[in-house]
Amino acid sequence: MREIVHLQTGQCGNQIGAAFWQTISGEHGLDGSGVYNGTSDLQLERLNVYFNEASGNKYVPRAVLVDLEPGTMDAVRAGPFGQLFRPDNFVFGQSGAGNNWAKGHYTEGAELVDQVLDVVRREAEGCDCLQGFQITHSLGGGTGAGMGTLLISKIREEFPDRMMATFSVVPSPKVSDTVVEPYNATLSIHQLVENSDETFCIDNEALYDICMRTLKLTNPSYGDLNHLVSAVMSGVTTCLRFPGQLNSDLRKLAVNMVPFPRLHFFMVGFAPLTSRGAHSFRAVTVPELTQQMFDPKNMMAASDFRNGRYLTCSAIFRGKVSMKEVEDQMRNVQNKNSSYFVEWIPTNVQTALCSIPPRGLKMSSTFVGNSTSIQELFKRIGDQFTRMFRRKAFLHWYTGEGMDEMEFTEAESNMNDLVSEYQQYQDASISEGEEEYEEEAPMEPEE
């Protein structure tokens, strides 16, 4: 029944992945060792999208855990849900990629990749009707970015007709982890543009802001950030895991969200987000959810949609919600903010409903938007990239692993093309007549 195989690569990917599995195990009534002790049949009905049933009433995630060093894996294994995963599905090297994309993509990662693909193949064979893959990784490091994109392209070769969704943590403007982030991210985006079907962009700084401003946490830990990400991942995948009135799967989401194949980078948001103390002062209603969901402060990527326009967006409501109320609210948002939606896609807001809310909430909503303002994010990375690349700073780390400067130039120009494509569709209007759309080349971005 429409299974999804999940991969997590690198430190960031494994930590987000672990939080995700913790969240959905809870939603489906599984304990830390995968034994079902839930209360509702709805939890079991489509459990097999993400879990494989093993002997003895135990459910095992269809997850492949990959890293080039054993550290993070050991932490996952020792964590509260460490006994959930199948031991053979931990694939790790010993050397680490040292934040070097080339090591992850060409040298260290390439040595490990066949081992990973064996595990992926085995998981895929255990599926009835595989729907696709999802991968969690960061774009700033070596393993998640370099090896993650290598895996995506290899899986693409082997399963060309399956969906590929990525949850990618992009480097944030202020919070930087390593100095070569712009290189790693640009090289990764170059790959994702070609090989992924939908990429959900998440950004640490935006997550920090949500934790500080909305959740009122004084010093948020990575655990808090990962919790937010897992809430969104759980929301995006909720239609796949529970029966609902208006269900969608990865492919339906892509059909509704991706007007042009290269423009598949989404902003995500989640509501309700309230600080612990303020819970009792707010009623969670559909208007409230809709308003918070479209609030720029709620977006988990550091780009403000008010600087661009939505090509498409999708909202997934969970809980006991009336269909009519949701549709009215969504129409309301569109009418009030019509200038933020492109007018040449008439019905660009899609809604899905699922009757089962997340744990501890009456109702919630998850937002996925394809906005042209995501180009800010690519522009920012591109600028940092160019500044370093002009001076050829740190390049020897990459050329030493056998990379060519040409590859950097290609990645840079591909990203610039992406930015100008977004810009072109942001500026396009109905009235310009048909001749605009016949030319294939993206217009030059106006400086």
Swiss-Prot record:
Species this chain originates from: Rhynchosporium secalis (Barley scald fungus)
Mainly resides where?
cytoplasm
Record annotation: effect of changing residue 198 to G? Resistance to benzimidazole
* Family stated for the protein in its record: Belongs to the tubulin family.
* UniProt xrefs under InterPro entries: Beta-tubulin_BS, Beta_tubulin, Tub_FtsZ_C, Tubulin, Tubulin/FtsZ-like_C, Tubulin/FtsZ_2-layer-sand-dom, Tubulin/FtsZ_GTPase_sf, Tubulin_C
Q: Where in the cell is it found?
A: Cytoplasm, Cytoskeleton
GO cellular component: a single term: cytoplasm
Molecular function via GO: GTP binding; GTPase activity; metal ion binding; structural constituent of cytoskeleton
Q: What is this protein called?
A: Tubulin beta chain
Q: Which Gene3D superfamilies match?
A: Helix hairpin bin, Tubulin/FtsZ, C-terminal domain, Tubulin/FtsZ, GTPase domain
Q: What is the lineage of its organism?
A: Eukaryota, Fungi, Dikarya, Ascomycota, Pezizomycotina
